[in-house]
Amino acid sequence: MFDKALKYSFAAQKRERYRLLRIILILLAMYILFNIISAFLFSSWVLHNNTMQPGLLPGDRFVVISNALPSLFAKLRRNDSQAPFNRGNIVIIDHGKGEKRNGFLTVADSFIRFFTAQRVSIFYRDNYIYAKRLVALPGDEISMTNFVLRVKPSGSSFTLTEFELSEKPYYPGIPQMPALWDDSLPFSGNMDPVILGPNECFVVSDDRSATGDSRTWGPIPVNYITGRPVFRYWPFTRIGRP
């Protein structure tokens, strides 16, 4: 009887070990799949600030298409400066890409985002990740008058407003400046012409009173753009293409 109980105990322990191993392998497979999908295909993202008003509001949630595969194809074609998006697109900026990140913390961050459904992250905080309006591509010449960007596309002889170059209409919030505020003061809403480099883009906030964009940072590298919101799924009252 003791031998039977001992054998049963060993068999039960073996089954439990296999069961635990299966659970671990399933979780590992889900984790790997999650990271592949998030890095190369799409992910969800929530807007936490009001810099893209009036079109986008804090709390809006989006499906974001990753820029990883288009960037990879551009490199394979040896055309690193080719931006896989258009003027007027809303894009996601990772302004922390220029920082060196600890390898262990990077792996830990991916685990944390996986097990919290991307609600918690070590790196992806409001001071790193932004949604901005892309208004100019590499090689473009840009200037600004009364908070409206004017763009001369690379290779073109004509200068157009940012709205004329956008596939979809949008309506930025234009601030009313005090009467005595002139061009010599900061953030006057005007900017002298600038020609972008071969790997540079120019992005702005839709709320033009919010200055955390290329007007302050300067042009950003193309690889800082990690994705593009293509669908707003929350709130339901404003569901659709952003």
Region roles according to the model:
Residues 22-40:
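Hydrophobic membrane-insertion alpha-helices, especially the h-region
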Residues 2-21, 41, 46, 55-242:
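Soluble "head" domains of membrane/secretory-pathway proteins
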